[in-house]
Regions:
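Exported/extracytosolic protein signature
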Residues: 1-184
């Protein structure tokens, strides 16, 4: 009686975190032509990998059209939380959303940022044409146009690239002048 050989095969699946970050504009008070308004952006960090990972520092960099002036900024973990959030301070024009948070495999974390904005047609470089969003040669939203805003992730912390890290909303001025003409 001879024993049959047994072949064992082990398959080791590579375990790794896989972080991605994306941004969207969720509320644009400037779309109706208001001079002073709020604009809300949602940032979502997701771990699509099989191991927990830290998001690393996530920052928010608005680059609005000239004349769209930020009066204040608030950061919260929910859109409703923005109403009671304290004012955030920018460092060199960049707001810190988080210094890093641990995300379990398959987990997501939301951050919200709200800017109170005033449209100032007297600002240097103001152009109504720049109040609309536009795209650059890579078909990505262009900075310095409309309510352009970008979330920045640390190197290696955004597996799906930066093209979905940009959001923009237009502002539409509704300034008009009525001239009356009459005869007697």
């Amino acid at each position: 009686n001879e024993a049959a050989p047994i072949t064992c095969t082990f398959v080791n699946e590579y375990q790794a975190p896989k972080l991605r970050v994306e941004k969207s504009i969720e509320a644009n008070g400037g779309a109706n032509g208001a001079t002073s308004f709020n604009v809300d952006y949602k940032i979502v960090a997701t771990n699509d990998g099989s191991l927990a990972a830290n998001t690393g520092k996530l920052t928010d960099k608005p680059d609005f059209a000239k004349g769209l002036e930020i009066q204040s900024a608030k950061i919260a973990e929910t859109q409703a939380g923005l109403d009671s959030a304290s004012n955030a301070t920018a460092t060199n024009g960049v707001y810190t959303l988080t210094d890093g948070v641990e995300l379990a495999a398959g987990a997501s974390k939301e951050y919200w940022i709200r800017f109170a904005v005033t449209r100032n047609p007297a600002a240097a470089g103001y152009s109504e044409a720049d109040l609309a969003c536009s795209v650059n040669g890579n078909n990505e939203k262009a900075p310095g146009k409309g309510l352009f805003n970008e979330v920045l992730a640390e190197n290696g912390k955004d597996s799906d690239g930066t093209s979905n890290n940009k959001a923009c909303g237009p502002t539409v001025p509704h300034d008009f002048v009525v001239i009356k003409a009459g005869t007697q």
